[in-house]
Amino acid sequence: MVFSISRRAALRLAFGGLAAAADFRPRKLFARDTSGDGDKVRVGAIRWDAWYAPDMAPGSSEWHAAHGLDPAKYHHRAPFFAEKIGTDRMFISGTQASMDAEISYAAKAGISYWAFGWYQFGRPLRKGWEYYQLSEHNALVNWCALIGLGSLAGNFPPTADLVRYFQYENYEKFGDRPLLYVMHDKSPLPAAARALDALRAACAAAGVGNPYVIAQSSVAKLGALDARGIGADAIGAYASAPAMTGGPIPYATLDAFVRKFWLEMAATGLPVVPNAMTGWDRRPRIERPPPFDPLHLNPDDYVIPGTPKDIAAHIEAAVAFVRAHRGTCEANNVLVYSWNECDEGGSVLCPTWSENGVDHSRLDAVARVLKQAQLL
């Protein structure tokens, strides 16, 4: 695949040079022509960019995530641009070249867009998005924002910023409607509903398409309550997995659970954007709990990683579900967990580090099934 870089070459590239928040603008781009996509199901993947300069913020979420992969047994979960600097130490600090390579990998595999977990300017968690917008290749993979219910209610990002982002040529849309994922939290629904009403009004005033908002929850009925409570357009999930209290479970159990979850979401009567799960092995966070993570699981509570073929078949099933439920899955869309949740879920689509070079076996398997599925 093009733009592939060595780990050492990536480390030689200097970090920095991004514009300040007030002046930041994306590189001028030309949108990828999707007019010939026809009946193709759009496949997105979630990004959580803890891998771009985490050591700039010691003690932060991104710092904990990156150093959670320090033990040798977790090195294989690190993104491909990581550098092994000790038996139990990785240096992970993505660069513009890293992002260019990620875009190329994703585009060649048939990934339509990334859903970026949203963070404020100045956080390393925001650097991945900034590098993406500065890339000469960012028209190859679209993007959209993924925010929390409380963020929506708290006007973060500000309404004016969202309206501006929605006008980016590479912002993912359903027709002319920009996608916006809103993840469940315990925030009051009325405030979020008012904020969403204001966002829709601001979009209308600016001549921007009415946002297509997907309320995300790992419980179908709760997602439906959120969607109806704030006036969202559809439901989906950031991640969903069975309760684990008796030791590791096979990936096949996760696969079956998620397929059942799609039906549960459809049974609410609301439109659905089905999720797909590449894995749910949280052992790095279980063994070295970061302060931001509310889950307190036992070390044996994890999903045994699936093979590349297993993961590809699961994503293929999500695409097939959309095709078989066109009325319910009106946005013609699937969202995959995840592209790069390397410490939380593992088995990510983003190519990863290995002693023998870049491991893109999972992404290659997914590319093969997506190519075949989109030809049907």
Regions found by a protein language model. Name each.
Residues V2-S4, A9-L29:
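N-terminal export signals
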